[in-house]
Amino acid sequence: MARYRCCRSQSRSRCYRQRRSRRRKRQSCQTQRRAMRCCRRRSRLRRRRH
């Protein structure tokens, strides 16, 4: 099962496949479609950190 992570602000239209990375745990989506949704949502929120 390939997991996709939300794209970064630089490239919203793209969602990357998640590789093994112990450093940071980003939001991971099980399907590319979900990742795309995540991308769009993130682009809207922009920099809104708690």
UniProtKB/Swiss-Prot annotation:
Main subcellular location: nucleus
One of the protein's GO biological processes: sperm DNA condensation
This protein's UniProt keywords: Chromosome, Developmental protein, Differentiation, Disulfide bond, DNA condensation, DNA-binding, Nucleosome core, Nucleus, Spermatogenesis
Gene Ontology molecular-function annotations: DNA binding
Protein's cellular compartments: Nucleus; Chromosome
InterPro entries membership: Protamine_P1 (IPR000221)
GO cellular component: nucleosome; nucleus
Tissue: Testis.
Pfam family of the protein (one): Protamine_P1
Family the entry assigns: Belongs to the protamine P1 family.
Quaternary structure, from the entry: Cross-linked by interchain disulfide bonds around the DNA-helix.
Protein name stated in the entry: Sperm protamine P1
Organism field: Pan paniscus
Record lineage: Eukaryota, Metazoa, Chordata, Craniata, Vertebrata
Gene: PRM1
